[in-house]
């Protein structure tokens, strides 16, 4: 099994989702799928980085109001506001993972400091960018983002500072990895936005961003890679 890498990466053609294709399902095997509207789908070829069951999927997904979660990290508290109206299936899954302790004692494995992509990516217990919860679910993509003024093609929109969104490996492959935007970023609107980072959390993100990306022997001044300031989520708490 070739693990997929869930990333948002910079290519000459533009910002795209990349990842190794998932292997074909063996003949006669059917993954488990929840029978509610979110249809959380088991991914046997990509097992969970940390054991967790499929989320509950009631006939009516809660789609009004907000919920709150706080990430307790070594760089400070990162309070999050989750928007059920904007992305009900995503919020339902995220809260499920929080309540199951999926994010506890995990690192934020990726920092990008490109002029047009400023995000911290978290949510993989393996710390490699290849791990997930052992299931996937559909996109709930934004439709009202302003166009990115720096993009002459008109294909990218602004994911503004403070946005909380899902990383993915292509259409309808959401799992557990998410990213926190610390500076306005230009992205194709292919990433589900499901909430926002509160001001206290943005201050913590700014501290991580100020430390930059950890240098490597191949690149002494990278703009994409592990944060120089190791960022660990000790505990994710639903409020």
Task: Indicate residue ranges for each PLM-predicted region.
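Cyclophilin-like peptidyl-prolyl cis-trans isomerases
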Residues: 2-9, 14, 19-239
């Amino acid at each position: 099994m070739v693990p997929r890498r869930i990333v948002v990466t910079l290519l000459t053609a533009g910002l795209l989702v990349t990842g190794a294709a998932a292997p074909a399902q063996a003949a006669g095997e059917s993954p488990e799928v929840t029978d509610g509207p979110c249809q959380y789908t088991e991914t046997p070829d990509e097992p969970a980085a940390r054991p967790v069951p499929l989320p509950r999927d009631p006939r009516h997904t809660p789609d009004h109001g907000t919920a709150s979660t706080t990430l307790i990290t070594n760089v400070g508290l990162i309070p999050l506001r989750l928007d059920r109206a904007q992305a009900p299936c995503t919020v339902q899954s995220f809260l499920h993972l929080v309540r199951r302790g999926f994010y506890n004692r995990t690192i934020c494995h990726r920092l990008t400091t490109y002029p047009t992509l400023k995000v911290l990516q978290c949510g993989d217990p393996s710390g490699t960018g290849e791990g997930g919860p052992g299931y996937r679910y559909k996109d709930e993509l934004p439709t009202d983002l302003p166009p990115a003024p720096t993009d002459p093609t008109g294909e990218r929109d602004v994911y503004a500072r403070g946005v909380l969104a899902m990383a993915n490996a292509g259409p309808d492959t959401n799992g557990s990895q998410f990213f926190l935007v610390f500076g306005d970023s230009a992205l194709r609107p292919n990433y589900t936005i499901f909430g926002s980072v509160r001001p206290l959390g943005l201050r913590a993100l700014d501290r991580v961003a100020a430390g930059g990306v950890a240098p490597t022997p191949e690149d002494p001044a990278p703009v994409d890679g592990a944060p120089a300031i190791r960022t660990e989520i000790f505990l994710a708490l639903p409020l």
